[in-house]
């Protein structure tokens, strides 16, 4: 037997239509991306989605201009150069590559994902932990935010912090540790 619903429960059920409810596939895709790239804040995903939508919209508007327009040529080249420098498109080839920029493209340029690509971590979860604990630096700066986007030019400067135990362990394993450098 089911108990009788209380007044506030009846009021809440009046707002829900169990016969014609909609399933949003965006939510499932969003959860899949959040889980795959270990995004901790949903706001990061929505920001990446907005940016990718803006890039696609800008590319579409540039494509609508006449083909010989000097503004179109100059702006398209600038857009492709910027997207290539950020690492969102594989080549500077054509403007159609802008249509394939998604939120996942931005997620692939996050620091933990780049750590995984550089084989500095075995799992994405470990890479996120390394970044949050301050074991990783990009250039001279220690980065503790996993949402940090690494450009193509900065990808070469991703290294361990000098005082990191992980760096010490890696150097000992490779038999490259210098006692003079790591006494700090």
Swiss-Prot record:
Gene Ontology MF terms: rRNA binding; snoRNA binding
Assembly, per entry: Part of the small subunit (SSU) processome, composed of more than 70 proteins and the RNA chaperone small nucleolar RNA (snoRNA) U3. Component of a heterotrimeric complex containing IMP3, IMP4 and MPHOSPH10. Interacts with MPHOSPH10.
Entry-linked InterPro entries: Ribosomal_uS4, Ribosomal_uS4_N, S4_RNA-bd, S4_RNA-bd_sf
Function: Component of the 60-80S U3 small nucleolar ribonucleoprotein (U3 snoRNP). Required for the early cleavages during pre-18S ribosomal RNA processing. Part of the small subunit (SSU) processome, first precursor of the small eukaryotic ribosomal subunit. During the assembly of the SSU processome in the nucleolus, many ribosome biogenesis factors, an RNA chaperone and ribosomal proteins associate with the nascent pre-rRNA and work in concert to generate RNA folding, modifications, rearrangements and cleavage as well as targeted degradation of pre-ribosomal RNA by the RNA exosome.
Coiled coil: none
Top-level taxon in the UniProt lineage: Eukaryota
Domain S4 RNA-binding residue range list: 109-175
Organism: Bos taurus
SUPFAM superfamilies reported in the protein's UniProt record: Alpha-L RNA-binding motif
Gene name per UniProt: IMP3
Family, similarity comment: Belongs to the universal ribosomal protein uS4 family.
PROSITE patterns given in the database record: S4 (PS50889)
Major place of residence: nucleus
PANTHER family: 30S 40S RIBOSOMAL PROTEIN, U3 SMALL NUCLEOLAR RIBONUCLEOPROTEIN PROTEIN IMP3
One Gene Ontology biological process: rRNA processing
Keywords associated with the record: Nucleus, Ribonucleoprotein, Ribosome biogenesis, RNA-binding, rRNA processing
Compartments (UniProt record): Nucleus, Nucleolus
Any Pfam family hit: Ribosomal_S4
Signal peptide: none
Lineage: Eukaryota, Metazoa, Chordata, Craniata, Vertebrata
Protein name, per record: U3 small nucleolar ribonucleoprotein protein IMP3
CDD domains on file: S4
GO cellular component, one term: small-subunit processome
């Amino acid at each position: 037997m089911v108990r009788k619903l209380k007044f506030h429960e009846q009021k809440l059920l009046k707002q829900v239509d169990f016969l014609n409810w909609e399933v949003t596939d965006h939510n499932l895709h969003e959860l899949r991306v959040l889980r795959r790239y270990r995004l901790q804040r949903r706001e990061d995903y929505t920001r990446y989605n907005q940016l990718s939508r803006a890039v696609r919209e800008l590319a579409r508007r540039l494509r609508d201009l006449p083909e010989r327009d000097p503004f179109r040529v100059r702006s398209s080249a600038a857009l492709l150069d910027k997207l290539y420098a950020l690492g969102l498109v594989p080549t500077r080839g054509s403007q159609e590559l802008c249509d394939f920029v998604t939120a996942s493209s931005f997620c692939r340029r996050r620091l933990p994902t780049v750590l995984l690509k550089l084989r500095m971590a075995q799992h994405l979860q470990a890479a996120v932990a390394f970044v949050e604990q301050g074991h990783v630096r990009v250039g001279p700066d220690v980065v503790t935010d996993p949402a940090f986007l690494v450009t193509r030019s900065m990808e070469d400067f991703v290294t361990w912090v000098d005082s990191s135990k992980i760096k010490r362990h890696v150097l000992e394993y490779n038999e490259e540790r210098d006692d003079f450098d790591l006494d700090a």
